[in-house]
Amino acid sequence: MEHDLTHGNVLKTIAVFALPYMLSYFLQMLYGMADLYMMGQFSGAAGITAVGNGAQTLYIITVTLVGLAMGTTVIVGHAVGSRRFDRAETAIGNTITLFMGVSVVLAAVLLALCPQIVALIGTPPEAVEGTAAYLRICFVGIPFIAAYNILSAIFRGLGDSRSPMYVIGVACTINIALDFLFIGHMGLGPVGAALGTVTAQTASVALALVWLKSRRTNIHVMRSDLRPQPEVLSSILKIGVPVAVQDGCIQVAFMFITVIANHRGLVDAAAVGLVEKMISFLFIVPSSMGATVSALTAQNAGAGKGNRARQVLKDAMTISVVHGCLITVLMWLVAPAFIGFFAKDAAVVAAGTGYMRSYIFDAIFAGIHICFSGFFAAYGKSYIGFAHNVLAVALIRVPGAWLLSNAYSDTLFPMGIASPCGSMLSAVICVIAFTVLNRRGAFDKLVA
């Protein structure tokens, strides 16, 4: 099941790895969009806001866990690249032990704090009940959400991006079917959306485990590999914690933006909730390129192929920037129709169009720093990604959105500019960091 990513044409290797990952990401976004579509058809602005706020909160938790799992992807990738499968087995076993413990504790804490979380994000009164119900159900499912994303991280470290695609395809089908049942037929609203999401994630974990056991591989995780080993856990956390914190900070910034929008009223709150969900969908390519760069670079770094690793970064970044330019032009042309497909309320469509047309420029600049962050993480330098993201959030994304929202109360267009400006700062920092480290030969060999 493991795949050698250290040979062959770089661009072709990127495409072969990235395309299944993109499809997996698309399918994950699809059933998130299905939730919003069904809520828009059967529930109205209050339901959209409840699911939008709840999904944004859950996404913070999910991406933080995924970021932490980056340590596993990189360590497993290093081991596969150097053909040390015993190290990969130990890393996988320790990851399972670590994340299952963390996810159970996290679920319990979040359930206890659910009312406070709903209040903290400034949920409009009309959407409080629905948001709380959505979050309680999703918090119960956190161990399953964590398990799926951990398994995906392990697959990527092994160079396999296809297996998660097959698994998530089944989960997506289940989720969409349940949305029609729970939201459309039974009228359960946000509760139905949450039940569909958690049930689909649970099914995906079960299927992934069955798939993993059925595949022939050089990796055989034994019970002894589950025993925590401080050195292994330290290696995983050294890479994963900065990535988790940086991803968490980005999502917290989005949550602050959601809070700002919530204080503007129900229409703007619904518009921002819709656009944020759509942006996740439109960012499939740069997000996929970031994961692709980390997986390919990890194996090539483990194999001592620094030049090939740098070529991976260059090609992936080119793909991301070209995509960003194309999608920006497209959204300027079709934003009203695109948003109108998910919302019938004309006021929500108008507000969302303005927000989308400024926010979408982020697709260009985010593609640059996401690829750099994946590259830095693969070389054990994930602290760089942490630093530039925290600076962008603290200096531009949040304060910029707040200031522009207050200055322009009649439109969301200026508020949307804050995100691409934050990504511009991140991109500049990444270019400087790469140039300095590359001149010092930091990417010529792997330093564990």
List the predicted regions and their residue ranges.
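Short alpha-helical transmembrane segments in multi-pass integral membrane proteins
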Residues: 1-18, 76-143, 185-241, 297-362, ...
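Small-residue hotspots at the loop-to-helix junctions and early N-terminal turns
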Residues: 43-56, 135, 194, 266-281, ...
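Helix-terminus/linker motif at the lipid-water interface of multi-pass membrane proteins
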Residues: 26, 30-49, 118-125, 181-188, ...
